[in-house]
Each structure stands twice: as structure tokens, then as C-alpha cells.
Amino acid sequence: MTQTTAAKEIHRIAMRSANDINDAIAATIGRGSVVVTEQDLCPEFFNLRTGFAGELLQKFVNYRVRLAVVLADPNAYGERFSELVREHATHGAVRFFRSEEDARQWLSS
């Protein structure tokens, strides 16, 4: 799903592998931002030991594509994951939200 807001596009893209991350970056670099929900992410994203979350977040930061991650309850994934969410509370490129509406509002700003 794509939403256009004042020359910005917000894309909803599933990211379950490194290839998906690269495809998402290629599709949106310079043209938009991405919102993902828990259902759009693989289980490895929530297990920080796999490195998948770090790779995903770092690529979005490096390529300056804004990413909003929607999670109903970040605490459900453990203390370390909750710390990651808190660390990104004011981040300029990657943030976590409890609702897709809040995520899209931030991406549109």
C-alpha cells in the first residue's frame, strides 16, 4: 500500500530477508518512507542476536529513508528489544509506534 502526502510517498513493505531490505531501500530512496508492522517482519527481527534488526535499521539510516515500525507491545520481545525501542524514541530516521496512524503521521511530517 502506498500513500502520497505532499510529494512524499509512504510505502508498506514486508521485510523478511536481507534482499527484502535492499528492495525496500531501492524502491523508496529519495522518494518516500516505509512503515512496517509486526506481521511485515520476520521472527529474526525480534531476536537481536541474529543481527537482522541492526542490519535493517542501519540500512535505512545510511540511505536516509525514514522507517516507522508499528508494534502493539514492544515489551513482548524482551528487555533488550524494549531498550532498542526506547533508544529510537527521538531518532530522526527510525522510530517505533504503537499504531499505524501515529507512524504515518510522523512519516508525513
Please provide the spans of the model-predicted regions.
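Amphipathic, Lys/Arg-enriched alpha-helical "gate/interface" segment within cytosolic domains
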Residues: 2-109
